[in-house]
């Protein structure tokens, strides 16, 4: 080729411009060759190409990216071939300026590709793990699309190119997600997926749900890597970090990350439960006909794009109809922007257009006050995100609802989850009233008769006899143990029951929900109920005749003289014996009123009412994680409302003091009037009055503040007793 009409400097400037892009093509081609396994040694010095050992095959995300570049260069070479043919045929006058002008769009694309490649691949440090490389590349493409999408119509070709690259590169990720949420198998040989399986925990282990998967998260700003275990919430990464670190690993999966984790774990658990062995063949046949997540995504994207093309004339004809809506939306958007002191008509128009694309606009803004979340993903770049929202997320959501729903149904129907939850309430929270009454009264009677009751064999025999009559299937699962606790506490009658621990053997997989940690909370409530019921029982079984007969017995046997001696041995008394007996009757009634009020409050207002709410929530639970949270929240609620939290320990101490008074009073009543001194009765009355007044004051303040509305019934009940005193 001869270009006689150009000077050397002019030719040089044109060729330098082209050569720069040639260097870009060379670097990209070198990456393609390396991933394909060709010419891995012939790297340019300092080119910073993919630093991988030749023995280790490139992971699938890089292979997919390479394939996308390869297809791009095929079309690029075809275009160059057309220009070359045109020059060879000499059909028209061709100058270098014309050639450069024809290549301008392609050169602009190469510039974008080079930027993406440099950031996403070339600049990644050599010792970086695959999980970071893959997510960094996908994030780079994702952010580039959002960035160019922001420009609008001026960069449509660039967005189209980047989108096609991203769709091709994301294929392995979506295939991994599909395999996991459909088959319950997380296949990731190169360890490039952000969720990794911990193989040390088998599926049939009770910790499977909490400790099986690890979610890796990387801050794009600082490049600091973190490992976060998807603990009981299993939703790590769904709201991680402030807006400065919003582009954590694989931003595009962020809105559905929780659903992916839930669906994947649920499907793996379902597969291992083998609850539908008879339908295995049918499931295999259905799977053969099933379209993969990636295929569904592509079809949705194509139908959305086609819909966009088809509807263009329709949009033009409907412009008049939509103009009014647009103006209405614009005025609403302007009002909401003014809340943040933003006065920008153009921004308001764009917001209005954006909201018109969303069918839930009126639902979102119907509430009045609106809080715009500034940390949300690029609110000005809705087109690409709307594509994802409508083309990818619904397919993941559908699979999430299907497999989580199946798991919940299987657990409830085949593994009797609801029955086990009811069993915990029957025995630990004593909702199986008559059964548990038979058990604990046998212990209380032993204590009253001063006999040994701490023998584990005796306790278990009593438990088995009580439970076996009405709940034979649960008797083999229940056991009770006794451990000696602090001896200083044991001096107080109310703490003599400390150390009693009820155990219920929960089978797998129900033990994922009813864990040993949950049983510890159940046991704390169980012990409190035992203490209240013991105080109540001790007061209930006292007979008026017992106290009267012990006072009148000496008189009947030895006459009036002996009676005077008996009275004298009680010490100096200001009141006759009958008045003393009357005071004890009154004190007993006051103690009974207090204990019964407390007992009714906990058994009805707390356990029964909260239990009904819990049952309803269990029925509504969509996935196992939600159910675990509901169960834990239920336990946390009853734990708090039974005043077992450290923060309100002073209230519990006052209640324990009254229960202790009741037990000491019952013990003294049993011993007979002769063992009582007037000072003892007066001190007991004084202690009770002080505790009673303290509790009424504290509870009333809490109710007036509105912080503990559930305490209102207890406060009113105790106030009624206060008036009597």
From Swiss-Prot:
Component of the gamma-tubulin ring complex (gTuRC) consisting of TUBGCP2, TUBGCP3, TUBGCP4, TUBGCP5 and TUBGCP6 and gamma-tubulin TUBG1 or TUBG2. TUBGCP2, TUBGCP3, TUBGCP4, TUBGCP5 and TUBGCP6 assemble in a 5:5:2:1:1 stoichiometry; each is associated with a gamma-tubulin, thereby arranging 14 gamma-tubulins in a helical manner. Gamma-tubulin at the first position is blocked by TUBGCP3 at the last position, allowing 13 protafilaments to grow into a microtubule. One of its GO terms (cellular component) is centrosome. This is Gamma-tubulin complex component 5. Component of the gamma-tubulin ring complex (gTuRC) which mediates microtubule nucleation. The gTuRC regulates the minus-end nucleation of alpha-beta tubulin heterodimers that grow into microtubule protafilaments, a critical step in centrosome duplication and spindle formation. It is found in: Cytoplasm, Cytoskeleton, Microtubule organizing center, Centrosome. Residues 222-246 are annotated as: Disordered. Residues 232-244 have a biased composition (Low complexity). Coiled coil: none annotated. Pfam families: GCP_C_terminal (PF04130), GCP_N_terminal (PF17681). Its main location: cytoplasm. GO terms for molecular function: gamma-tubulin binding; microtubule binding; microtubule minus-end binding. Disulfide bonds: none annotated. Belongs to the TUBGCP family. The lineage of its organism: Eukaryota, Metazoa, Chordata, Craniata, Vertebrata. GO terms for biological process: cytoplasmic microtubule organization; meiotic cell cycle; microtubule nucleation; mitotic cell cycle; spindle assembly. Keywords: Cytoplasm, Cytoskeleton, Microtubule.
């Amino acid at each position: 080729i001869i270009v006689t009409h150009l000077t050397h400097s002019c030719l040089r400037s044109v060729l330098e411009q082209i050569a720069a892009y040639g260097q870009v093509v060379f670097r990209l081609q070198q990456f393609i060759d390396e991933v394909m396994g060709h010419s891995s040694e012939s790297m340019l010095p300092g080119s910073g190409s993919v630093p991988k050992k030749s023995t280790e095959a490139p992971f699938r995300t890089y292979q997919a990216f390479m394939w996308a570049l390869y297809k791009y260069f095929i079309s690029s070479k075809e275009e160059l071939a057309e220009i070359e043919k045109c020059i060879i045929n000499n059909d028209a006058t061709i100058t270098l300026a014309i050639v450069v002008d024809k290549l301008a769009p392609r050169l602009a694309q190469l510039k974008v590709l080079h930027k993406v490649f440099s950031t996403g691949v070339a600049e990644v440090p050599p010792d970086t793990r695959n999980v970071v490389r893959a997510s960094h590349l996908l994030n780079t493409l994702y952010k580039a699309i959002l960035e160019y999408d922001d420009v609008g119509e001026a960069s449509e070709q660039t967005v189209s190119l980047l989108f096609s690259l991203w769709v091709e590169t994301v294929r392995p990720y979506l295939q991994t997600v599909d395999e996991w949420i459909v088959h319950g198998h997380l296949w990731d040989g190169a360890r490039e997926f952000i969720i990794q399986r911990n193989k040390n925990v088998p599926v049939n282990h009770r910790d499977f749900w909490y400790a099986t998967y690890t979610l890796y998260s990387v801050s794009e700003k600082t490049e600091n890597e973190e490992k976060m275990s998807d603990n009981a919430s299993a939703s790590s990464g769904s709201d991680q970090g402030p807006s400065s670190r919003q582009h954590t690993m694989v931003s595009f999966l962020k809105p559905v990350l929780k659903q992916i984790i839930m669906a994947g774990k649920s499907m793996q658990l379902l597969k291992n439960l083998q609850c539908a062995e008879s339908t295995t063949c049918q499931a295999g046949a259905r799977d053969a006909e099933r379209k993969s997540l990636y295929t569904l995504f592509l079809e949705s994207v194509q139908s959305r794009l086609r819909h966009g093309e088809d509807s263009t004339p329709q949009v033009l004809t409907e412009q008049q109809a939509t103009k009014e809506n647009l103006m209405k939306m614009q005025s609403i958007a302007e009002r909401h922007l003014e809340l943040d002191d933003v006065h920008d008509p153009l921004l308001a128009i764009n917001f209005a257009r954006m909201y018109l694309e969303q069918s839930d606009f009126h639902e979102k803004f119907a509430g009045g006050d609106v809080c715009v979340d500034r940390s949300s993903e690029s609110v000005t770049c809705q087109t690409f995100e709307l594509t994802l929202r409508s083309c990818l997320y619904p397919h993941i959501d559908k699979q999430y609802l299907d497999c989580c729903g199946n798991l919940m149904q299987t657990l409830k129907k085949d593994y009797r989850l609801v029955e086990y939850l009811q069993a915990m309430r029957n025995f630990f929270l004593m909702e199986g009233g008559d059964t548990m009454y038979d058990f604990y009264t046998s212990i209380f009677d032993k204590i009253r008769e001063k006999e040994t009751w701490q023998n584990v064999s005796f306790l278990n025999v009593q438990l088995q006899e009580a439970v076996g009559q009405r709940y034979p299937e649960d008797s083999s699962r229940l056991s009770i143990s006794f451990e000696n606790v602090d001896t200083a506490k044991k001096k107080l009658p109310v703490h003599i029951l400390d150390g009693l621990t009820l155990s219920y053997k929960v089978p797998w997989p129900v033990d994922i929900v009813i864990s040993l940690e949950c049983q510890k909370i159940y046991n704390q409530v169980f012990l409190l109920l035992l203490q209240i019921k013991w105080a109540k029982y001790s007061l209930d079984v006292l007979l008026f005749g017992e106290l009267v007969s012990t006072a009148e017995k000496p008189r009947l046997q030895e006459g009036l003289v002996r009676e005077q001696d008996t009275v004298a041995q009680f010490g100096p008394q200001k009141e006759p014996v009958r008045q003393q007996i009357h005071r004890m009757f009154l004190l007993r009634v006051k103690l009974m009123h207090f204990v019964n009020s407390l007992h009714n409050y906990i058994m009805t207002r707390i356990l029964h009412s909260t239990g009904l709410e819990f049952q309803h929530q269990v029925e509504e639970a969509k996935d196992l994680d939600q159910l675990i949270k509901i169960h834990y929240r239920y336990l946390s609620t009853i734990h708090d409302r039974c005043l077992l939290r450290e923060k309100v320990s002073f209230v519990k101490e006052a209640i324990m003091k009254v229960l202790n008074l009741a037990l000491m009073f019952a013990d003294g009543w049993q011993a007979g009037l002769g063992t009582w001194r007037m000072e003892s009765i007066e001190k007991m009355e004084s202690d009770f009055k002080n505790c009673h007044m303290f509790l009424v004051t504290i509870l009333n303040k809490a109710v007036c503040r509105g912080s503990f509305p559930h305490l209102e019934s207890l406060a009113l009940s105790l106030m009624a007793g206060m008036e009597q005193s």
